[in-house]
Amino acid sequence: MFINHLHNTDIILASGSPRRKQLLEDAGINFRIHTKNVEENYPVYLQRSEIPLYLSKIKAHAVKADFPDSLIIAADTIVVQRRDVFNKPGSAEEAKDMLRKLSNNMHEVITGVTICYGEKERSFYDITEVFFKPLSETYINYYIENHKPFDKAGAYGIQEWLGMVGIKKIQGDFYNVMGLPVSKLIDELEKMFNPELELNQINSNRPEEPNKYLYFGI
């Protein structure tokens, strides 16, 4: 079973996020943390789903350079509302502005993940739609003053107070909003350690060929 391979593999989480650390621990994966300071800039022509993929690859490759024989897991999360991309707020005012825009609206949370292991590399992303109720200025100010969400894309954590009282519904993976789509990550790790699994999946999704020997008579 591929889980046994994971227990015998040096796994590095290339992220300092406490949420990603918690999620990997809860998934039963043994790992250590190593981060590198990288410029989180991206080309302006990238599509929104490509942005976190691009940044996760930069993070993964930076750590892989120091630990070429380890399995590296890197991730990046952005919040998107129409044409606006929300990263981590740099100030309380910026956080307030983000939450005012998210209030009574739907936005998408997109997490890109890159896994590197030797010559193998896999990248994927997941999208979750989040619907906020109307957020009063009192709620916004209270949350920012007490929870200081300056390390979170979109200026909120779904697992925190504002997520509990302010989110009306979500469509997609809850853990993706926390910063790591664990179910997809496990699937991709299993494919990495068991290539036949991916081949079987491709074959099972392939449409059936038409019957070459089916004839219609008149």
From Swiss-Prot:
GO BP terms: nucleotide metabolic process
Enzyme Commission number(s) of this protein: 3.6.1.9
Catalytic site positions: D76
This protein's UniProt keywords: Cytoplasm, Hydrolase, Nucleotide metabolism
SUPFAM superfamilies: ITPase-like (SSF52972)
Cellular component, GO, one term: cytoplasm
Substrates-to-products reaction catalysed: dTTP + H2O = dTMP + diphosphate + H(+); UTP + H2O = UMP + diphosphate + H(+)
UniProt KW Flavoprotein keyword: no
Main location: cytoplasm
Site (Important for substrate specificity): R19, T77, Q159
Stored Pfam families: Maf
Protein localization: Cytoplasm
A GO MF label: dTTP diphosphatase activity
Source species, domain of life: Bacteria
Enzyme class: hydrolase
Functional description taken from the UniProt entry: Nucleoside triphosphate pyrophosphatase that hydrolyzes dTTP and UTP. May have a dual role in cell division arrest and in preventing the incorporation of modified nucleotides into cellular nucleic acids.
PANTHER family listed in its UniProt record: BIFUNCTIONAL DTTP/UTP PYROPHOSPHATASE/METHYLTRANSFERASE PROTEIN-RELATED, BIFUNCTIONAL DTTP_UTP PYROPHOSPHATASE_METHYLTRANSFERASE PROTEIN-RELATED
UniProt protein name: dTTP/UTP pyrophosphatase
